[in-house]
């Protein structure tokens, strides 16, 4: 059996989860990564996506996050999300609003750097939409 470690998922509004887990899959800025007990220290930004956790009791749970940071140590993992909600509570209209806002930001981009960042963010949101709300 995998060794358990402490995991916390925090948004500005509240603490969404604080539990002993055996595995956390995080949408890191360079791609999805899995944190396990004893993981090498790592701090990374996270992109919009789904954080999946496997609790110490064997149950699994998932949360939708919209950016933030992940701090992984050998003893635990903390995800500080800009915004987060349980996957069962996600509002499809909220995702669509975020996509429309990202499209507007892309249209209003004043430099190539801003345009590139806006394109990446829009793509991440559309990928997330397809992941949690398949056609």
Swiss-Prot record:
Protein family per UniProt:
Belongs to the ATPase epsilon chain family.
Which organism is the protein's source?
Brucella anthropi (strain ATCC 49188 / DSM 6882 / CCUG 24695 / JCM 21032 / LMG 3331 / NBRC 15819 / NCTC 12168 / Alc 37) (Ochrobactrum anthropi)
Name the chain's protein: ATP synthase epsilon chain
Q: Name one Pfam family in it.
A: ATP-synt_DE_N
Membrane topology type: Peripheral membrane protein
The cross-references to HAMAP family, in alphabetical order and at most eight, read: ATP_synth_epsil_bac
Look up keyword RNA-binding and say if it applies: no
Identify the Gene3D superfamilies for this entry: F0F1 ATP synthase delta/epsilon subunit, N-terminal (2.60.15.10)
Q: Name one GO cellular component term.
A: plasma membrane
Gene coding for it: atpC
Q: What does this protein do?
A: Produces ATP from ADP in the presence of a proton gradient across the membrane.
């Amino acid at each position: 059996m995998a060794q358990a470690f402490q995991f916390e998922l925090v948004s500005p509004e509240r603490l969404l989860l604080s539990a002993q887990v055996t595995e956390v899959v995080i949408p890191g800025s360079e791609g999805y990564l899995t944190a396990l007990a004893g993981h090498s220290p790592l701090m990374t930004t996270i992109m919009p996506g789904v954080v999946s956790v496997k609790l110490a009791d064997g149950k699994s749970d998932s949360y939708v996050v919209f950016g933030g940071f992940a701090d992984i140590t050998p003893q635990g993992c903390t995800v500080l999300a800009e915004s987060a909600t349980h996957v069962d509570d996600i509002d499809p209209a909220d995702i669509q609003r975020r996509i429309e806002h990202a499209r507007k930001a892309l249209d209003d981009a004043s430099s190539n750097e801003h345009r590139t960042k806006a394109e990446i963010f829009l793509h991440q949101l559309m990928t997330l939409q397809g992941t949690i709300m398949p056609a």
